[in-house]
């Protein structure tokens, strides 16, 4: 016994032995990560891979440092030549970058081979935040957005104009003599958020400060889960550590649902149910997503399955999904327009276009359904901002879900669980697609420049531009194909209206230098501290 005791005492406490064993375990673990976890891409080139003992682990740890410049450089070197390459990830979840020539191949794969649903759930940690999601409710919401909400946007122009004008006037004032300094991000938020909430949830809460605070609290927690659990935490830790880290998000979600969403949804749903059973009932529901989705769920005939909790949870998650990118893009547009050289007269051209498009008739004005479609130059300026500053550097993301994996057109085989995406920032900066791509050219997407001298034969050709929502394999902020962002029409509508109202009603001093964006985990967000000098115009 004494010999055994001495042995265990030695092995338990000898620092040399402990250090040797620990070092061996660490090296073994790193070797397994290098060879197994980071090997699915085979011989594909990696961004930032350098010779060394653990080149791919090192590349992953440097991934955030490489950032957008590294992704653009890799696209130029590989993607622009039709080659697949690998973007390392600080969470040890490398992603295969798909060149533009093979986007169609990705889109043609069935969802049981390359799944957009599984990719989104992993990237946003939705499997932890929405553990009881119902595919029927998901489908109803998507169909409602496509077939009801999008088709009613122009009809609701007056509603949007009411929210944007009320909130911008309150934020910036109506004093035509005094210049004021205003935070750009906060100003945009005050205009966009209420308008977004009004069409998603309804008029009863869109200006409620307590509702805004609770939604903001949940959105911040959701963002925390997305960054930490969805992007930083290694996949094998998500079921345990990820669930623990998502508990704050779940708590804030449940509190928000019980306080706001479930009572509102229950009231609306059962009023519509009574209306469907008794057409003579005196009830006119407000035109918003709650009404349209409730109608669609009732039309399925499966009322028992339509849980107000499940409905509310899906509705609530749409706000942090839609609001940040819409606010970021509107802020970026303002930064870009105010940063253009004075000799381009961008503000003047946009103001004159808006002034010409506005119909001063009492029943028209900002409520005119035809107003926004007439803003061709502004449409181009917004599209150019989204080209230069897409919120997501990678889009069209998919996850390999086929049991046997999938083989790329180039011949490389990818196992189940591999992530793929398209480097949007690389394509958007490709000189072969967009000449002088590094320059913000607000009227790049028009068929001619404002003030351009025309031949007599061309004067009859109207000024046009490519629509903000038009997705192609060279313009990817919204994705591409049938799974492109279904809410892009709403986002574009709110951005265009907000910027148009601001430029028409307020003088804005130009920036000496554009405020810089911050890139975190592939997401490019505008400076939230930058301010602008504004003064109400005298009309």
From Swiss-Prot:
Uses in industry and biotechnology: Polytolypin and biosynthesis intermediate compounds show antifungal activity and can efficiently inhibit the growth of the pathogenic funfus Candida albicans.
GO biological-process terms attached to the record: secondary metabolic process
Listed pathway(s): Secondary metabolite biosynthesis; terpenoid biosynthesis
Highest taxon above the source species: Eukaryota
Function: Cytochrome P450 monooxygenase; part of the gene cluster that mediates the biosynthesis of antifungal fernane-type triterpenoid polytolypin. PolE acts as a dual functional P450 monooxygenase which can catalyze the formation of both the 1-beta-hydroxyl group and 10-beta-carboxyl group, however the oxidation sequence of polE has still to be determined.
GO CC, any one term: membrane
Family per record: Belongs to the cytochrome P450 family.
Lineage, broadest ranks: Eukaryota, Fungi, Dikarya, Ascomycota, Pezizomycotina
Protein name per Swiss-Prot or TrEMBL: Cytochrome P450 monooxygenase polE
Catalytic activity field: 2alpha-hydroxyl, 4beta-carboxyl motiol + 4 reduced [NADPH--hemoprotein reductase] + 4 O2 = polytolypin + 4 oxidized [NADPH--hemoprotein reductase] + 5 H2O + 5 H(+); 4beta-carboxyl motiol + 4 reduced [NADPH--hemoprotein reductase] + 4 O2 = 2-deoxypolytolypin + 4 oxidized [NADPH--hemoprotein reductase] + 5 H2O + 5 H(+)
UniProtKB keywords: Heme, Iron, Membrane, Metal-binding, Monooxygenase, Oxidoreductase, Transmembrane, Transmembrane helix
Residues where heme binds: 435
Coiled coil regions, renumbered to chain: none
Cross-referenced InterPro entries: Cyt_P450, Cyt_P450_E_grp-IV, Cyt_P450_sf
Organism: Polytolypa hystricis (strain UAMH7299)
Residues annotated as transmembrane: 13-33
Localization (cell): Membrane
